[in-house]
Design a protein with these regions (language model features):
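Beta-strand elements within well-structured catalytic alpha/beta cores of enzymes
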Residues: 52-56, 86-91, 176, 197-210, ...
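Internal, conserved structured core segments that host functional sites
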Residues: 133-188, 193
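A short aromatic-anchored loop/beta-hairpin motif
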Residues: 37-145
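Short, basic/glycine-rich phosphate-binding loops at helix/coil junctions
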Residues: 54-55, 112-119, 166-175, 252
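Long, well-ordered alpha-helical scaffolding segments within enzyme catalytic domains
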Residues: 70-80, 185-200
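Surface-exposed, charge/polar-rich loops and edge strands
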Residues: 172, 182, 195-203, 212-307
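N-terminal export leaders
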Residues: 15-33
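N-terminal secretory signal peptides
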Residues: 1-14
């Protein structure tokens, strides 16, 4: 039997507070058609030029439908570069044994949370998928045997941010899963194999949160505009220093960086997407931080644009 995804799905009985706490070979005719389609895709990719790389702090699922400074940051950042030919998103909310990429034509919108307003569950983000990009990604990666997934779709780590960037859902989106059996350095090295996609107009997005400790959320500060515990602010400051200095080794070896990092990253899934984004950076590229705030004590929304 195929390995089932180890996702971050939450019971529908959870309320919002609990969520935060818990939170090929073809016939000749077919081949001709395929080549024509690939030519169109290649033409489109060539026209966009090299894409930047993003890490987006996605925060609460409510950011999908709320108008706040964080979604404004996503929107404004998307306006600073050309519309991509496609998006490849590495989301904190899709963990599997082995690495998968979504390969369907039309990925479903996954509402992988519970206890939120009906309005949030009614959101659909009907962006097309890209089987061609999924196959190209599979062929690029030599570090692992990439599986082609036909069941997952777009989880809220992807659609809750991308819908603000491309509200018309007119950019193809695929997701890549996080192999929960592998160490951080493995993820970093795998990400480096994706660099050629940037040259083909693919926007690669890591979606998570640098500091993400739901067990230590400050309940009395949930509605504060900005609040971070001292340890969260200290860990965030060190992370940002390493990022801006292009010093990735301590970020990869985060478990050896002391108590503040241990509190900031109690589990790896929201942090690992950052390593994917950093691995794709080049020495001469500009690095910009935005949405740089701590919320609810133990979460940061800090996001990164590279290139």
């Amino acid at each position: 039997l195929p390995e089932q995804p180890k996702s971050n799905l939450l019971s529908n009985s959870l309320n919002r507070t609990q969520f935060i706490q818990a939170i090929s070979f073809l016939p000749l005719t077919g081949l001709t058609m395929k080549l024509e389609g690939l030519k169109k895709m290649t033409d489109s990719l060539e026209s966009t030029g090299k894409m930047p790389v993003l890490f987006l702090g996605h925060g609460s699922p409510m950011n999908a439908i709320e108008e706040n400074e964080f979604v404004q940051g996503f929107r404004k950042t998307a306006q600073t570069f050309e519309k991509p030919a496609a998006v490849l998103c590495i989301s904190a909310h899709w963990e599997t044994r082995g690495t998968q990429v979504t390969a369907m034509d039309f990925p479903r919108t996954i509402h992988d949370f519970g206890g939120f307003p009906k309005e949030l569950f009614e959101v659909q983000y009907p962006a097309p998928g890209s089987p061609d990009l999924a196959h190209e990604t599979k062929n690029l990666v030599q570090k692992a045997e990439i599986g082609l997934d036909e069941k997952w779709g777009l989880d809220h780590g992807a659609w809750s941010v991308i819908r603000h960037m491309y509200p018309d859902a007119d950019v193809p989106v695929i997701q890549m899963s996080l192999d929960y059996t592998k160490p951080p350095v493995w993820h970093y090295e795998l990400a480096k194999e994706l660099v050629k996609l940037r040259e083909k107009g693919v926007l690669i997005i890591g979606s998570g949160n640098m500091v993400h400790n739901l067990r230590r959320v400050a309940w009395n500060k949930l509605n504060a505009e900005e609040f971070g515990y001292d340890w969260a602010i200290e860990a965030s400051a060190k992370m940002k220093e390493f990022i801006l200095d292009r010093n990735h080794k301590p970020l990869i070896d985060y478990s050896s960086q002391g108590k503040t990092f241990q509190l900031a990253i109690p589990t790896p899934e929201h942090y690992l997407p950052l390593l994917y984004s950093l691995a794709l950076s080049e020495n001469n590229e500009e690095i910009l931080l935005f949405n740089d705030k701590a919320v609810a004590g133990s979460l940061t929304m800090t996001s990164v644009k590279i290139g």
